[in-house]
Amino acid sequence: MMRTRCIISLLVVAAFMILSQPAIADDLADLKATDQGFWKAWNTGDMETVFQIWQDGGIWLPANRAFPDVTNSAIGKQMFTKWFETHMYWSIWHKVDYKVIGDTGLVWGLRTTTAIVKATGTGKRFFYKTTVVYVKSEGKWQAVMSQDTPLISEADIF
């Protein structure tokens, strides 16, 4: 009797694990697409899309502390809009990993960021370890926290 219960319990657990795998795979694919969409929007200065993905009240911990922590507020939108009017800016992930745990998505990796002042053509390149935390809310992934940690000092590129 005890043996039968153990076998049934194991079968139930195995069935649950097998059935939950497609949902995890779908969540992982959605997380990757959302994160890639965020950086595409960021790299093209599409602040509307950036602030659709960035959750109101989200925390940004920049490496250089040149900007305040940003939320989806009028001040944050205005600051970044002004920044993109005067700079060309893009970020590239070199090695990125994704993990989904329930309704929480984790993205971490190595990132290179380039910023060029449009008026002068001078620029800098930054090298970071970046971690972004997403939360799935109403079927959509939203970034709630991002932290950049510099790997080496910034480099003048022009």
What do the PLM-derived regions correspond to, one by one?
Residues 103-115, 128:
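A short hydrophobic beta-strand element
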Residues 28-30, 47-102, 122-125:
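A solvent-exposed, acidic/Ser-Thr-rich amphipathic alpha-helical stretch
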Residues 86, 114-124, 152:
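Short, cysteine-centered beta-strand-loop-beta hairpins and adjacent loop/turn segments enriched
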Residues 12-14, 18-56, 103, 155-158:
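Short, low-complexity N-terminal intrinsically disordered segments enriched in polar/charged residues
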Residues 54, 111-113, 147-150:
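Short beta-strand segments enriched in hydrophobic/aromatic residues
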Residues 1-11:
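Bacterial N-terminal signal peptides that target proteins for export
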Residues 127-154:
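Short beta-strand edge/turn micro-motifs at domain boundaries
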Residues 98-106, 121, 134-140:
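A short, structured loop/turn motif at beta-sheet edges
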